[in-house]
A protein has these predicted regions:
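C-terminal structural segment of proteins
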Residues: 1-355
Length: 355
């Protein structure tokens, strides 16, 4: 049986108290929310904090404020179930609710939080094993060893970014607010993740993720498509987030009603004359950080979203995707699926156009 190591558990009631505790206790302390990632890692001796600081009772981290026409703020301790069931998110940001609904199982979504999913540890077949298994192979570069078994000749850890919400947040242009005793800062989700399986976040250990800021829903739509072996529980071995913002043929942004809760997009306006003003395709589950496919975006921008452009964007995603043999399924097949899942995501966005 894998047991948790001994640790001190703290329950601050304010953000100021929480960041002071972590500043006072130093690098051997760590924040925890739902614990669905941290506690299994502690049982496997992948992470060994001596002080664990719960942020589940901080009021500011447990609320959603704002409105879609100017953007909303989501507290980092909102559970994934809260996100899936929230009426504002379902109505105005259905891609967020749809992506959150693909995460794990209902029981774990009841505990896991949106902030925890955005800070999820990178994953690898050689790392996500119990201590005895890892010891038998002399550990790995990510923890206690000196070789990346995925690419033994590389000095880099290739553990993959396996969050379902990260590609979506990068695609739609979300921002994250971090707070420490030194102050606070906002960082774009697109600039928050490093292409390194060990040092995978641009976040200091003393910083607390307080909330996520979503942009206004001004004419954009989005979709998230996930590849996994089972229809529940599994992490993505490929995730594709597609974001498209339209303008009319005369260059004006569309006007119309907000998207309903069907599908997984957001935005306003309809009609076959619209061209794409901005687009992003973001791949998750294939590299240490989310992969933005600029070539896919360029295939879409300035043109109507039709079959030819969708095919070109999907082909660009296939070319850019370079998964390694460090998770489920044969990596060559996962590369092939980058094309198919980009097609699915963009066709989903296209299907939302008449709503």
């Amino acid at each position: 049986m894998m047991r948790l190591p001994k640790f001190v558990y703290r329950t601050p009631r304010t953000i100021a108290e929480a960041v002071k505790i972590v500043a006072d206790t130093g690098p051997e302390s760590q924040f925890v929310a739902g614990g669905t990632d941290l506690y299994p890692n502690m049982k496997r001796r992948q992470q060994m904090p001596k002080t664990v600081i719960s942020v589940m009772r901080l009021p500011e981290l447990n609320q959603i404020t704002g409105e879609s026409k100017s953007g909303i703020r989501i507290g980092a301790s909102m559970t994934l179930t809260d996100i899936v069931e929230n009426e504002i998110i379902k109505r105005d940001y259905p891609v967020i609710a749809a992506a959150a609904h693909t995460i794990s199982t209902p029981i774990l979504r009841n505990m896991g939080t949106i902030g925890g999913n955005l800070l999820l540890d990178t994953r690898c077949n050689y790392y996500d094993q119990n201590y005895e298994w890892r010891k038998a192979i002399n550990f790995c570069l990510k923890k206690d060893g000196d070789v990346c078994w995925v690419a033994p000749g590389s000095s880099k850890c290739w553990a993959v970014q396996s969050s379902d919400l990260v590609p979506v947040m990068v695609a739609i242009g979300a921002k994250l607010r971090l707070v420490s005793t030194l102050g606070e800062r906002m960082i774009d989700a697109s600039g928050f993740y490093n292409d390194d399986g060990i040092d995978y976040l641009k976040k200091r250990p003393d910083e607390l993720l307080v909330d996520i800021h979503l942009p206004a829903t001004n004419g954009w739509r989005a979709s998230y498509q996930k590849l996994r072996r089972r229809g529940a529980f599994d992490f993505p071995v490929l995730g594709v987030a597609a974001y498209v913002r339209y303008e009319s043929a005369d260059g004006a942004l569309p006007h119309g009603r907000a998207s309903d809760t069907r599908g997984s997009g957001v935005g306003t306006g309809s009609g076959s004359d619209r061209v794409v003003a901005d687009a992003k395709i973001v791949l998750g589950g294939i590299a240490p950080s989310p992969v933005q496919v600029n070539e896919s975006a360029q295939a879409l921008i300035g043109k109507p979203l039709n079959e030819d452009q969708i095919q070109a964007a999907a082909e660009a995603a296939y070319i850019k995707a370079r998964p390694l043999d460090n998770t489920d399924f044969v990596y060559q097949w996962r590369k092939q699926m980058a094309r198919q899942y980009t097609l699915r995501a963009l066709n989903d966005v296209h299907s939302q156009s008449g709503r």
